[in-house]
Amino acid sequence: GRFFSAVMFSGSHRQSLRELQQENADIAAIDCVTYALLQRHQPQALAGLVAIGWSPAAPGLPLITAGATPAATLNSLREALQQLVSDDRYRSLCDALLICGYSDMSREAYAPLLAWRDEAAALGVSQL
């Protein structure tokens, strides 16, 4: 490739971290939630590794349902998710999963991701 001699797909973030620790890889992209959960619960999984950079803040991964889901069901799902993050009964669960809120997002909220992709392509990073 243009930037690395080889690209490998480990199959999981945890395996990518192992590959780094075993010096089978030079760099890996690990999502911030996985990284934070490992820092909190299994710091040994990050032993000997250093974060060399962070991507800009972006909306989280979308929650997806079937396109044919009725509007009433969508509303019920959204209400349930909002209750989950608002109800004290679920606070410890949300804290454990690093969930601090829920909000409906439009497709436009994800536009910065496409802009970053386009910016990278303009700099010559369209694929590794």
Regions found by a protein language model. Give the residues of each.
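Ligand-binding cleft/hinge of the Venus flytrap
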Residues: 1-9, 37-44, 118-119
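Short helix-initiation/N-cap motifs at beta->coil->alpha
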Residues: 1-18, 57-59
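Histidine- and/or cysteine-centered catalytic micro-motif in compact active-site loops
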Residues: 12-13, 32-35, 54
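A ligand-binding cleft/hinge motif common to bilobed small-molecule-binding domains
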Residues: 19-21, 26-46
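Periplasmic-binding protein-like
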Residues: 43-81, 95-114
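Generic secondary-structure signature for well-ordered alpha-helical cores
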Residues: 82-86
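Tryptophan-rich aromatic "cage" segments
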Residues: 116-128
